[in-house]
Amino acid sequence: EGSVETNIVDLGNILPGHQISDTYIAVKTVVAELIKLNILPIILGGGQDITYAQYLAYETLEQKVDLVVVDSHFDMDEDITETIETNSIAYLNKIFLHEPNYLFNFSNIGYQTYFVNQDSLRVMEKLFFDAVRLGEISGSVHLAEPIIRNANMLSFDISSIRGSDAMANGNAGPNGFYGEEACQICRYAGYNDKLTSIGFYEFNPAYDQNGQTAMLMAQMVWCFIDGFYNRKNDVPLFHKADYVTYKTSLTEEAHELVFIKSKKTDR
């Protein structure tokens, strides 16, 4: 139980379509309609390729997207299909190459170096995308908050959590986030005034033991909802008096950087 009165509705399950594309279109349509109604959808289960359908909802809304993915891998394998269909290890290519392009920025949180090839890292650097290695953030999960703060949508792969805490995944491994770190990431996502959808993917109950992963996912959702109901509403910027502006010049460039800090939250 939380300290606030919540308004939550279980809309049931989206059944798999005859083709994968049918499932994508169903998810895309539902997510887009809910966002139009100012309702934040929480997607549970399914492969992480559903992230692509979640992203397509913003195309329907003609809205630029800042996408954050919590994952131990970069799911950028070559996708040879020219249709809407993809899979859980190639969906990012589908998003990056999608036309028209509504992707404003992409960030990965928690990648593990031995799962990522150097070509993928070079692609991230070339596109000016953010990628934070697990070793950089483990034990200092608060470093994820500035990245999550700008996200419009978030995709959380359960395999990014260590197998001892979340074994209900075909790709579960010995390393990853601790359960409490995953919950903190979800709380940060809930705090984000800009976030309008979130998905938790790759949960497979066939691999679960004593419902432990299901319990952890429930706690992650609880933390997200708790964060949502504690939003400070300091985005977008309404009154200049509510913010402190810092300006700095770059010595080698003729550009000025402007930082804006909320007096309400110190963010």
PLM segments and residue spans:
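Conserved alpha-helical scaffold segments that buttress catalytic/binding sites
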Residues: 1-200, 204-267
